[in-house]
Regions:
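Non-catalytic DNA-binding core/recognition domains of DNA-processing enzymes
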Residues: 1-12, 27, 124
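Gram-positive cell-envelope targeting signals
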Residues: 3, 40-42, 79-81, 163-168, ...
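Short, basic/aromatic-rich helical patch in the C-terminal catalytic core of site-specific tyrosine
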Residues: 6-10, 80, 172-173, 190
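Hydrophobic recognition helices of helix-based DNA-binding modules
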Residues: 6-14, 132-135, 175, 179
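Basic, Lys/Arg- and aromatic-enriched nucleic-acid-binding interface segment
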Residues: 15, 19-77, 81, 90, ...
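Conserved tyrosine-mediated DNA breakage-rejoining catalytic core shared by Y-recombinases
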Residues: 29, 82-140
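Short, basic (Lys/Arg/His-rich) helix/loop patches that form interaction surfaces
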Residues: 52-63, 73, 122, 138-153, ...
Length: 190
């Protein structure tokens, strides 16, 4: 993101004849190595095994609906965290038109999808539909802070603030560790 902003700023500086060359007009992947671990999609059998494990685990059972929704929709974590009570249960659709993010310095903020294909409607399978119904019911009438015009986020922390990707990254990492300790066939990094 920083590189994109700097590149745009230098492009304008070139247009205004303030500088001759754009020092940020290079492909970042030529300079930095992508050291993120490869993500693997779970097989249907692995998904069932993970959900069964979570349902029977004293620590992680409270996350079962969240995992069902994540696995059943393929939402990005920030899109998932941005879900509000404004769901189309009649047509069983999840409309994706924003994502919830949090910056350590500036706090929570909403971002719209970067491309047209990011705006989409995701059909609710029966398990996802039932999980969302339970989440809305268990959430009750709690009101949450308004973030860039959005309120009533579905997934809240104990203090009433919305959960963000980092909250789930830690939970999922620890869940997978525990699952893999107890099963012969470990799950891949997801």
């Amino acid at each position: 993101n920083y590189k994109r902003s700097l590149r745009a700023a230098f492009f304008i500086a070139i247009e205004d004849d303030c500088v001759r060359k754009n020092p940020f007009s290079f492909a970042l992947n030529k300079v930095l190595e992508d050291n993120r671990g490869e993500k693997t999609v779970l097989t249907p059998e692995q998904e069932v095994s993970l959900i069964d494990f979570v349902q029977n685990d004293k620590v992680y059972r409270k996350y079962v609906d969240e995992l069902i929704i994540l696995l059943g929709t393929g939402l990005r974590i920030s899109e998932f965290c941005g879900l509000t009570t404004n769901l189309d249960f009649k047509n069983r659709l999840i409309r994706v038109d924003h994502q919830l993010l949090r910056d350590p310095k500036s706090g929570y903020y909403i971002e719209t999808p970067k491309t047209k294909s990011g705006y989409r409607e995701i059909p609710m399978s029966e398990p996802v539909y039932q999980a969302l119904k339970r989440v809305v019911k268990n959430r009750g009438k709690k009101t949450t802070i308004m973030i860039d015009g959005y309120t009533n986020f579905l997934f809240l922390k104990r203090d009433g603030t919305p959960k963000v990707g980092m909250d789930y990254n830690n939970m999922i990492r620890n869940l997978l560790k525990k699952y893999n300790k107890q099963h012969k066939e470990p799950l891949p990094n997801i």
